[in-house]
Amino acid sequence: MMAITRSVTVAAGKFASGHLGELTAVIPFELVDAVLHETRRLQRRLRDLPSRVGIYFLLAMCLFPEVGYRLVWDKLTAGLANVPVASPTPKALRDLRRRLGATPVRALFDVLAGPLARPTTPGVSFGPYRTVSFDGCSSQKVPDTERNRAWLGRTSHHGYPTLELMTLVETGTRALLGVVFGPTDEGETSYASRLLHLLRPHMLVLWDKGFDGNAFLAAVSATRAQFLGRLRSNRRTPVLTRLADGSYLSVIGTVRVRVIDAQITVTCADGTCFTGSYRLATSLTDSRRYPAASLTRLYHQRWEHESAYYALRHTIMAGRVLRSGDPNGVKQEMWALLTLYQALRTIMVDAAESVPGTDPDRCGFTIAFQAARDQVVQAAGVGTANYAADGRIGQKLLAGLLPARRQRVSTRKVKSPMSRYSERHDDGRPDVTLAVISLDISIHEPPETQPALPTRSRDDRYVLPTRRRRHRILALLQENPTRLWRPREIAAHFGDITLHTMYRQLSRWADDGLIHKIGPGLYAATAWTSTPLA
């Protein structure tokens, strides 16, 4: 038998239950008190549940989303065996939430939000620029109550009302720089416009398709931040100046951009080979300093944003619906969840930077999350000053560092019988995750001239069947079955078909199964599969 004695350092008196274990070092008592004072939410008289305790209870509520109010409180006080603490009812804890409101939690998040890593930390910068990204998420569900429905509305593909969450993320650490959320019907670019004040001239912002509107590009350009984003397939960009690396200078609205038309061929460990096309626009117009192939490789960092959302929705929340039945409670809970997420990322980055040369993405979010839960239950590490070196969470992170990131690929799936996506295009990506052994990037130069398309389609009702339009087009596609054709290219090739007719007929033939639609405006003779091409 062996006796183990340990000491616990917490706040005195009625404030003892107000802690978050080792995360208290990231969100100290002084910061919480200052935020409460600034937002005028500090208690006027000292009760059994002071306002500071309420803030830590809100954060613990997100740290333990699987249990109710009373069990969350029990976890906060489990390590305080010899300390007299209150024993509130669930109603008392609900009343505590209402007294606080969402304002102090949002103010606390605003203090913690921002870039976390040094510019020299691996994976954080591209040349002199810190890489960040915009992206939205509309899959966070809230309780199906009348008040929530009045605020968020209904959706045809979800049983619960959902929030639209727009974030600006530091891709190297997945830390949050800024967040807005609300009803899903407002649109991603509208929400993203509210975060533009956070961009700085030393930042390079990445985004997916849908953010290339003229007004949004002009607003981003006005911040003097650089950008690299994907263009929609129907966006037409004039060729102003051809560059040596195959890209070209163009203009979108009033913004001067450089357009990169890249084709990426991926070879996987099992021999699977597939090709994808990316059309990017960037404000980095110097092709010698920023080659097109390097920017195309950099664009892959945008997917770090998806990992941030995975940590929020699945690692912390495990896909659960939020607790709150009214809009004010939903806002308060979301800001608490985001604050907790940022605190965990802060410890992860500090732990990675304590070992020079360590990429922050080697630190496991699940390790940090579970270690933080353990520390709360034990009330351990509350007074830890140097949590990166001396803290238990940091030690667990460094002991369980993930291997250096390797390139992998798999298809995107919606594992739900009720999906907002009408169909899944087979683009050749494997159904299971595979390692990538080679990545070949080729930059397509723009054509010398855009051929003029006819204004009228030729009537082919009175020609031989072998000379009719459908036969000729199918024969053209069969010459190179894996080539991706655009309607304009086919119309220009034959010269006797209008673009409108070409779009209409290709769509009908794809519905009939004669050809295959690979993506928006992309057609091929055969479907792309994971089988290596002969």
Enumerate the language-model features and the residues they cover.
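Alpha-helical DNA-recognition elements
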Residues: 95, 99, 508, 512
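Short amphipathic alpha-helical interaction segments
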Residues: 497-508
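Short, cationic-aromatic polyanion-contact patches
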Residues: 466-470, 520-534
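Single, function-defining residue in the core of a domain
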Residues: 1-71, 97-100, 107-108, 127-128, ...
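Hydrophobic residues on short alpha-helical segments
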Residues: 57-58, 470-478
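Short helix-capping/hinge SLiMs at alpha-helix to coil transitions
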Residues: 63, 478-483
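A short, conserved structural fragment
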Residues: 510-520
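Short acidic, hydrophobic short linear motifs in intrinsically disordered regions
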Residues: 483-493
